[in-house]
A protein has these predicted regions:
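Active-site phosphate-binding strand-loop segment of PLP-dependent enzymes
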Residues: 146-215
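PLP-dependent enzyme catalytic core of the Aspartate aminotransferase-like
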Residues: 331-332, 341-351, 356-385
Length: 385
């Protein structure tokens, strides 16, 4: 009786929902499932952030509509954090926009700039909302292969001239989900020059900048000369402070791009619960030792998993950022089938690489969001299949 729009029909099933369904079904059957699939931190939000929410929630003024552009205190806290972390000065009134998690901002941004037939240049494999947001805006996603032989960086010179002329946005994400690859200044300089020459907006997803190891410190594209003219950067409190369920992030960078996204959002949502924004101020302005301890915890888990994978003969790159390990499928089968084998025979959930795009075929992603004891148990199970 009712027919879905073509845009919705063009959207692939959301990978993580499909994985969650399979996981819940297995657990309902009484199976002991080790979930290495979805990247949802297993540790609690720091106590001082929860207390800030608790206190702010008691204030009746916070029960009303929030300001569309976010609390001034939160925008100022983000500006201070960016200055301290990256040495980047931002105007809190025009160059920062709080979001209901960075995901919604990333997905809504194409609505501001894509017309039918316009392209977004989307990493493949990549975070699904880049492609989904493009399709829902009426644009066309053009896949940029991220290949191991090129360190999982897009080869900008290989993008056809005809595509460049129709492209309005390029999405990049380093440290990368799902590959855990990183990018350095040389790549960002090339990207900025490419964007300026072709009049393309850079959307940089920096959600994993604070999850890093072995002395590595990820960059912000806004550190580089000329970036602010063509770039908008998205960040989130989800991974840094274990706040995935709180839904709080932001966009920062070019003031005109911020204003365009703000206009889209003003027609779609009514802002972020003010108490959550106050908690965000506490997160960014409070003690940061917790972040270091979380990175140390993930590092130990990474080392445990990498050691076990090496013993199994599975090929994986040792990540120096994010809490993901990108692993070559060790048998002659596709990633979905292999993930199914791990679920059925070992009660282990992993994410098939093809769920992030066709160039993710041949890989699976494991997340470091379970205890080291559970990782060891998973490795023991893998030995038996």
């Amino acid at each position: 009786m009712f027919k879905l729009s073509k845009k919705l029909q063009d959207l692939p099933p959301y990978l993580f929902l499909e994985i969650d369904k399979a996981k819940r079904k297995a657990r309902a059957a009484g199976r002991d499932i080790i979930d290495l699939g979805i990247g949802d931190p297993d540790q609690p939000t720091p106590r001082h952030i929860i207390e800030a929410l608790d206190q702010a929630a008691l204030d009746p003024l916070n029960h009303r509509y929030a300001l569309d552009q976010g609390l001034p205190a939160l925008r100022r806290a983000i500006a201070v954090w960016y200055q301290d972390r990256f040495g980047v000065g931002l105007n809190p009134d025009s160059e920062i926009l709080p979001l209901i998690g960075s995901k919604e901002g990333l997905a809504h941004f194409p609505l501001a700039f894509l017309n039918p037939g316009d392209y977004s240049l989307v990493p493949d494999p990549g975070y699904p909302p880049y492609k989904g947001g493009t399709i829902l805006a009426g644009g066309k996603p053009y896949s940029l292969p991220l290949r191991e032989e090129n360190s999982f960086l897009p080869e900008l010179k290989k993008i056809p001239l005809g595509v460049r002329k129709k492209a309005k946005i390029i999405f990049v994400n380093y440290p990368n989900n799902p590959t855990s690859a990183t990018a350095e200044k040389a790549f960002y300089k090339e990207l900025i020059a490419f964007a300026r020459k072709n009049k393309i907006i850079i959307v940089s997803d920096l959600a994993y900048s604070e999850i890093s190891y072995d002395g590595y410190r990820p960059l912000s594209i806004l550190e580089l000369e000329g970036a602010r003219e063509v770039s908008l950067e998205f960040h989130s409190l989800s991974k840094t402070y274990n706040m995935t369920g709180w839904r709080l992030g932001w966009a920062s960078g070019n003031a005109k791009l911020i204003a365009a996204l703000a206009k889209v959002k003003s027609n779609i949502d009514s802002g972020i619960f003010s108490a959550v924004q106050s908690a965000g101020v506490a997160a960014l302005s409070g003690p940061q030792e917790y972040v270091k301890s979380m990175c140390n915890l993930y590092r130990k888990r990474r080392d445990c998993l990498m050691e076990g994978l090496d013993l199994l003969g599975w090929k994986a790159h040792r990540p120096k950022a994010t809490f993901y390990v990108w692993i070559k499928v060790p048998k002659a089968t596709n990633s979905i089938k292999f993930a199914g084998v791990l679920l059925e025979k070992a009660n282990i959930v992993v994410t098939p690489g093809v769920g992030f795009g066709r160039c993710g075929e041949g890989y699976i992603r494991m997340a470091l969001t379970v205890s080291k004891e559970r990782i060891r148990e998973a490795l023991e199970r893998l030995k038996k299949i």
